[in-house]
Swiss-Prot record:
SUPFAM superfamilies: P-loop containing nucleoside triphosphate hydrolases. Transmembrane segments: none annotated. PANTHER family: UPF0273 PROTEIN TM_0370 (PTHR43637:SF1). Belongs to the UPF0273 family. It comes from Methanopyrus kandleri (strain AV19 / DSM 6324 / JCM 9639 / NBRC 100938). This is UPF0273 protein MK0039. InterPro entries: KaiC-like_dom, KaiC_dom, P-loop_NTPase, UPF0273_KaiC-like. It comes from the Archaea. Residues 4-248 form the KaiC domain. Disulfide bonds: none annotated. Keywords: ATP-binding, Nucleotide-binding.
Length: 252
């Protein structure tokens, strides 16, 4: 039976994933600072909206007003889809302090309370009948209590998959950290995409690699990508060699 897939909406990324993300998968998008994790997650939501798939974007590390302003730089108008009832932005950043309590429909008062967060996300998903969810990021949920990281990720995955959503869960790691952030989180998700920003001989290179993706074959190579005025663009026909700072054609 053919695997039902969800397009990432990121040029070149679906080719890396052999056609897209398997439906209902929870994907950990991990990487260091400045690697493009937030843009990737927002582009995933935007692509769905453009294809008629409602979505939910959860922000834990940036004011929702700033989120809307930032995406406009790529030509993505979140406000329009919010007004149409196709997009919900969940504010898990302000804690309802200030004017956010007046203007934001979905507010998490205590972002460190996983149960409250899950409850608000569930409500938002049901209200807009979301097919896609992006959480930026899950790191604050367990940064002070790493022992519960895996359990929290399981709860999020179970809830989102149960509601029929395909999700991107942004996760932070240190610039040169080899792990995925939080003990055991890699076992609690269906897929892992790692973004990297490496300095080689005085130049910064962006690249990504799919560490795992349940339900589908995928490229096992590290591919270069760039951030343009229209978002992220991946080159599935090229492979990046970190040690040498070289980009080569993919060989069969």
């Amino acid at each position: 039976m053919a695997v039902e897939r969800v397009s990432t909406g990121i040029p070149g990324m679906d080719e890396v994933l052999n056609g897209g993300i398997p439906e209902r998968n929870a994907v950990l998008l991990t990487g260091g600072p400045g690697t493009g994790k937030t843009i990737f997650s927002q582009q995933f939501i935007w692509a769905g909206l453009e294809e008629g798939e409602p979505g939910v974007f959860v922000t834990l590390e940036e004011h929702p007003v700033q989120v809307r302003k930032n995406v406009e730089g790529f030509g993505w108008n979140f406000r329009e889809y919010e007004e149409e009832g196709l997009l919900a932005v969940v504010d898990a950043f302000t804690g309802g302090i200030g004017r956010a309590s007046e203007y934001e429909k979905y507010v998490v008062k205590d972002p460190t309370d996983a149960s409250e967060l899950i409850g608000v996300i569930r409500q938002a998903v049901n209200d807009v009948e979301a097919k896609r969810v992006a959480i930026d990021s899950v790191t604050p949920l367990y940064i002070d209590k790493p022992s519960v990281a895996r359990r929290i990720m399981f709860r999020l995955k179970r809830m989102l998959a149960g509601l029929g959503c395909t999700s991107i869960l942004v996760n932070q790691i240190a610039a040169h950290e080899r792990g995925f952030g939080g003990p055991g989180v890699e076992h609690a998700v269906d897929g892992i995409i790692r973004l990297d920003l490496d300095e080689v001989e005085g130049r910064l290179w962006r690249s990504l690699i799919v560490w795992k993706m349940r339900g589908t074959a995928h490229s096992m190579r590290r591919h270069p990508f760039e951030i343009t005025d229209e978002g992220i663009r991946v080159d599935p026909e090229k492979v990046f060699v970190k040690e040498r700072g070289e980009v080569r054609e993919v060989e069969d």
